């Protein structure tokens, strides 16, 4: 049984995206990637799973004088690399990196029950004991594009209300869905304008999200909800506002290829944090995913150095914009059973899959000089 811990009001959260037996489509999230080759593994001094990843001082050093909080994404609900890592160890790793938010993906039934309670419940208990906040990313599992808007709203409200009724005592912030705009984009569009989206699919999605938001807040009146997008797909978030979805936080995903392309014509966006501030002046901004995308043409050492540089530089931008409240890196561990990119996103890499790992140099990226 899950103990009742009053730990939902700790402020901002660290997000590790844990997928309930599903995975994010990170390689499809934006700009096309040509890197499909596997990176070579580097063997070095390993650390056992029981050891913390990095010192708390590293992030605190980076964020000195700032109110920005940080987090990490993880996939502990069925992903192979997490099968031998206990909930206690995951929370220890989060705390060891100076983070206090862990973002997890949660699949729930229409009754609001998480599909893997034997993994979810211990994580809640360990997070409470370790003073780490969990950000649940709740999938729109019952949404159907064939539904009417009224039917979609009702389904969303039922799922949201039931989830908050069962678990609301653990959370203040709820992340509604992931990569939702990708299924709505029309071909050869950027996602900046409302004309770039399939209106029929958008209406069904927006109705579901409105219901989900209303349902959560009907059972958890103090709840704050967030909805995300990536690349230049902020048009989706603006359309949700116009539709009447009362989400509270702009959640955004940003990767190194986006950072390189955005400043160039015709985009002319040198700082995505400032662009989002101009579009959403009254909402806090959270980056619920950010990281460097490895290049197959680079050596492993070159990629790790570039990853460290991107993470450090992007966090400086976040720190310098007070509207950005939380920055969540993607992801905790390399996942070599998946794609080339998923094999390399981690701040920790495997020495002996899946029993021993060690820090990448990007694990020290959160240090400002």
Language-model regions: role of each:
Residues 21-23:
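C-terminal motif of bacterial Sec signal peptides marking the signal peptidase cleavage site
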Residues 40-100, 105:
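Boundary/entry segment of secreted carbohydrate-active catalytic domains
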Residues 82, 180, 190-192, 197, ...:
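Aromatic-rich peripheral "rim/lid" segments of glycoside hydrolase catalytic domains that contact
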Residues 90-144, 148-160, 197-226, 266:
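Aromatic-lined substrate-binding rim segments of carbohydrate-active enzymes
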Residues 136, 178, 231-267, 284, ...:
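Aromatic- and acid-rich polysaccharide-binding/catalytic face
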Residues 142, 279-311, 331-346:
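Active-site clefts of carbohydrate-active enzymes
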Residues 162-199, 226-228, 325-333:
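Active-site groove signature of glycoside hydrolases
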Residues 206-236, 282-293, 326-334:
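Aromatic-lined carbohydrate-recognition surfaces of secreted/lumenal glycan-active proteins
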